């Protein structure tokens, strides 16, 4: 259940977006925010950037921002929501451990699956081990299932969803 110990100079980056039309992936995406966790010598720093309307540049938002987003859902209905880019202090609501900013997502079990690389399709953890990026990982690692995959057991799907989306706050540890 541990998160990797990243060296100083590491950057964890995640971009948030809404599809323009969920029925047509070729319609593109509306970029909203890119979040960075930057590993410094003395710990992690959280930084949020909000994308402009032209979708060609993002600007640092220390105080956060609210973005009105509209899209078409799978049924063809027009939807809208007020998306909130967190301010620096709000980042700590999820990413704090012992009063310090810390990553919560890059756990071995969450990336223990195959990805497409230039050299072919490989398990992410095996790929990292072969390149000496990591030394080891638990070989009997149980990874979450794709919660949208209706062929999977409903209990596994629910547990996977809750683990990935809720477990970092709602945890006995």
Each model region followed by its residue ranges:
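Short, well-ordered loop/turn sites that connect or cap secondary structure elements
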Residues: 6-9
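Sequence context surrounding c-type heme c attachment/ligation sites in exported
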Residues: 3, 22-173
